[in-house]
């Protein structure tokens, strides 16, 4: 019987995030917090809440509570978009820099440790397969 690849990949992501979560405990950030901060850094500056929610893969209402909490921690500020008063733009504060640097450091170290013993060629091959799977899934979504 074949291994359920989707379940295997989901489990891999879950335990990978749990490891990072454990290592970031001293920062007193929940998994949702550090994932949100990490995604804010990956996007161009002052993205809208809608764009951030899409990048993370969640609905915007689900993101609002997390952003409220990050704002309470003085890690982000939100302001109304000049072009669309309904939209909110997200900006990192100066307080967020050291936190994000530590989050990114832990993520990078953890990734390197996880990939220990895996060659660069194997990593490139894995990335190609993941990209193909993602493309196929997106194409299937677009058909429906």
UniProtKB/Swiss-Prot annotation:
Residues 49-72 bind DNA. Keywords: Activator, DNA-binding, Repressor, Transcription, Transcription regulation. InterPro entries: HTH_MarR-typ, MarR/SlyA-like, Tscrpt_reg_MarR-type_CS, Tscrpt_reg_SlyA, WH-like_DNA-bd_sf, WH_DNA-bd_sf. The keyword DNA-binding applies. Residues 2-135 form the HTH marR-type domain. GO terms for biological process: response to stress. Gene3D superfamilies: Winged helix-like DNA-binding domain superfamily/Winged helix DNA-binding domain. Coiled coil: none annotated. The keyword Transcription applies. One of its GO terms (molecular function) is DNA-binding transcription factor activity. Homodimer. Belongs to the SlyA family. PANTHER family: TRANSCRIPTIONAL REGULATOR SLYA (PTHR33164:SF64), TRANSCRIPTIONAL REGULATOR, MARR FAMILY (PTHR33164). HAMAP family: HTH_type_SlyA (MF_01819). Transcription regulator that can specifically activate or repress expression of target genes. This is Transcriptional regulator SlyA. It comes from Blochmanniella pennsylvanica (strain BPEN). The gene is slyA.
């Amino acid at each position: 019987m074949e291994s359920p690849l989707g379940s295997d990949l989901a489990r891999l992501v879950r335990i990978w995030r749990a490891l990072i979560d454990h290592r970031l405990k001293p920062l007193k950030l929940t998994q949702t917090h550090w994932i949100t901060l990490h995604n804010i850094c990956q996007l161009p500056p002052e993205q809208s809440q809608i764009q951030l929610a899409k990048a993370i893969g969640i609905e915007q209402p689900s993101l609002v509570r997390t952003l409220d909490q990050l704002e309470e921690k003085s890690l982000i500020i939100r302001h109304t978009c000049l072009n669309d008063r309904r939209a909110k733009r997200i900006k990192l504060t100066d307080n967020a820099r050291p936190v994000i640097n530590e989050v990114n450091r832990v993520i990078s170290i953890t990734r390197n440790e996880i990939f220990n013993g895996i060659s660069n060629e194997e990593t490139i091959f894995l990335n190609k397969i993941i990209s193909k799977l993602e493309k196929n899934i997106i194409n299937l979504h677009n058909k429906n």
